[in-house]
UniProtKB/Swiss-Prot annotation:
Any single GO CC term annotated in Swiss-Prot or TrEMBL for this entry: small ribosomal subunit
Gene Ontology MF terms: rRNA binding; structural constituent of ribosome
Record protein name field: Small ribosomal subunit protein uS4
Known partners and oligomeric status: Part of the 30S ribosomal subunit. Contacts protein S5. The interaction surface between S4 and S5 is involved in control of translational fidelity.
Domain S4 RNA-binding: 93-153
Organism of provenance: Lactobacillus delbrueckii subsp. bulgaricus (strain ATCC 11842 / DSM 20081 / BCRC 10696 / JCM 1002 / NBRC 13953 / NCIMB 11778 / NCTC 12712 / WDCM 00102 / Lb 14)
Function: One of the primary rRNA binding proteins, it binds directly to 16S rRNA where it nucleates assembly of the body of the 30S subunit. With S5 and S12 plays an important role in translational accuracy.
Amino acid sequence: MSRYTGPSWKRSRRLGISLSGTGKELARRSYIPGQHGPNHRGRLSEYGMQLQEKQKLRWMFGLNERQFRTLFARAGKIREGQHGTNFMILLERRLDNVVYRLGLATTREQARQLVNHGHITVDGKRVDIPSYEVKVGQTISLKEKSKNLQQVKDALEAVASRPSFVSFDEDKMEGQLVRFPERDEMEPEIDEALVVEYYNKLL
């Protein structure tokens, strides 16, 4: 399945959350496209709620359905912890997401572009695979010439805070995943139990 390439604001308004994390998509209108006001949203069925939550999480991290389902299945094979929480942790460990969490990009989409274009290194070696799974203690940085990118400078200036499961050295412009995140440190807008229920009916 191909990745959606349409306007992200339409998806954000449809789901009622900011998928980019910036909040700009909902600044003017928080109701879905096609509605003429905020009070015309229909009530979803149980399946509709599960599907919507799955789409919300998938679009938030920018994965296509095949990638998303594969990662979900992997999470189910982890013996310790809950399936949904383990799935969220695997999503957080993606290289593009860690780049975003470190503040080197303002959105996950921008972080994915940095990785795709070869600007990111892991332990000193260039990695251009957004789905690369970051291990605790690995050092994430920019290629030396990439440290002067204006979009990176702008992103770093915009950082208000970083989650405690990552560390960042401002002088070296490099950071690490210091531990796996706890559930309350990950996306609060997501009810991953609904995602688990959705796939349990299919798989």
